[in-house]
Design a protein with these regions (language model features):
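A short, internal acetyl-CoA/4′-phosphopantetheine-binding micro-motif in the GNAT/acyltransferase core
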Residues: 93-105, 274-284
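Acyl/amide activation-and-transfer machinery of modular secondary-metabolite enzymes
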Residues: 88-98, 147-154
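Aromatic (often tryptophan-rich) hydrophobic motifs at membrane interfaces
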Residues: 56, 79, 84, 88, ...
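A conserved beta-strand-loop-helix scaffold within acyl/acetyltransferase catalytic domains
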Residues: 5-61, 67-81, 132-149, 160-282
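Short catalytic-loop micro-motif centered on adjacent basic/acidic residues
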Residues: 125-127, 188-189, 304-308
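Non-catalytic accessory segments adjacent to catalytic cores
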Residues: 104-152
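Active-site/acyl-donor-binding loops of N-acyltransferases
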Residues: 2-8, 71-73, 139-163, 300-366
Length: 366
């Protein structure tokens, strides 16, 4: 089946059938983003209700193209809901897109891919496109295609840690990292999964704090967090990623005060998750020290960038910017049989506003 006049390509395999070619392409090039590897898709499948529906294409020039894709378990292809990747499994600026043999995908190849997805979207196909492919996708995506935009923050590590420390970190970061050491904060890092339970306890504390900050009912916030981010998810990533996943905990006086999870592949290090006990961490500089240690390790390993991920709040944006980050666009494209994504987003926003208003009425003294 011809999918594009400008660049012709055909589907060769889907799911397990695409795996040998996919593993071959990923093994050839360590610079390929982690989100485009079979190992990351296996993490998603092991820890959530998705199955591998990755597509392998062959272009008329002989090049192979891979679209990492997952299908909600229990749905046939023609009625399926496809994600690339599912919500909660993005990796910041390393957000996915297409893996192309011989270098980055060209606009004509992406056009061919878009044409195919438009013809066969299932009920919905959602594709998140980050740093590697964002510009090419934006140049050819049809105006009628629904798209949302996010922003990731990335720190350039070129020049080594001494350059990053002296020229990119702000004086505030340097001061707080030193203060943490003076106040007895010690960072412990592990890539065996041993610290996952410690991190998870900090994460549950953070969920309670986020509920208060966002004006959400505590029980609802806890339920959503347990559903989307259970401890088993962190454990699965740590186990499957092995040395590519480092859990770091900042300790003070024998108590954990903050933690981060960092993933690595090739030139990239990605800050994937973070959590803290805000009362214990307050005024200690623990978070700055955690990231300083992770960034120093990434520099020592020869990484080129440290991805702080997509910011969720203005407070987090300001914190990450103090490390000297630059902003990277991340686009999310929705291919739908029935155009409902935009309406769902509006309803979701309206529902959050109603909940917040109800909480203000219930607690008038606050």
């Amino acid at each position: 089946m011809v999918l594009s006049q400008a660049y012709r390509m055909c589907i060769e395999a889907e799911g397990a059938g695409a795996r040998p070619a996919w593993e071959d392409l990923a093994a050839r090039d360590e610079s390929i983003a982690l989100s485009k590897t079979p190992q990351w898709i296996d993490c998603v499948c092991s820890a959530s209700r998705f199955s591998d529906a990755t597509l392998l294409f062959r272009g008329d020039d002989g090049r192979r193209l891979i679209l990492p894709r997952l299908r909600k378990t229990g749905t046939p292809s023609f009625l399926g809901q496809f994600e690339s990747p599912p919500q909660g499994w993005g990796l910041g600026a390393d957000a996915g897109g297409v893996l192309t043999e011989g270098g980055p995908a060209s606009p004509s190849q992406i056009t061919a891919l878009i044409e195919h997805i438009q013809r066969h979207p299932g009920l919905r196909t959602r594709i998140m496109v980050g740093e590697d492919d964002a510009e090419a996708w934006a140049s050819v995506a049809p105006n009628a295609l629904y798209c949302t935009s996010r922003t990731a923050q990335v720190l350039d590590l070129r020049g080594g840690f001494s350059t990053v420390w002296s020229k990119r970190f702000t004086s505030k970061v340097r001061s707080n990292a030193r203060k943490a050491e003076r106040r007895g904060v010690v960072v412990e890092s592990d890539n065996t999964g041993r610290l996952v339970s410690v991190f998870d306890a900090l994460y549950r504390d953070s969920v309670d704090r986020w509920a208060q900050q966002r004006g959400q009912p505590l029980s609802l916030m806890r339920w959503r967090a347990q559903r989307r981010e259970p401890q088993s998810k962190f454990a699965t990533v740590a186990q499957r990623m092995g040395t590519r996943c480092t859990v770091s905990i900042a300790w003070r006086q024998g108590e954990p005060v903050a933690g981060i999870v960092v993933l690595t592949r090739g030139p990239r290090a990605t800050y994937w998750r973070g959590a803290m006990d805000k009362e214990r961490a307050r005024g200690t500089g623990a978070n700055e020290l955690l990231h300083r240690c992770a960034i120093e390790a990434a520099c020592a390993e020869g990484r080129h960038s440290y991805d702080f991920g997509i910011y969720q709040t203005e407070e987090l944006k300001r914190f990450k910017s103090t490390f000297g980050t630059h902003e990277v666009p991340v686009h999310v494209y929705y291919f739908e049989r029935l155009p409902t994504a935009a309406a769902e987003a509006k309803c979701h926003h309206a529902a959050k506003q109603v909940v917040r208003a109800a909480l203000r009425v219930a607690r008038p003294g606050r």
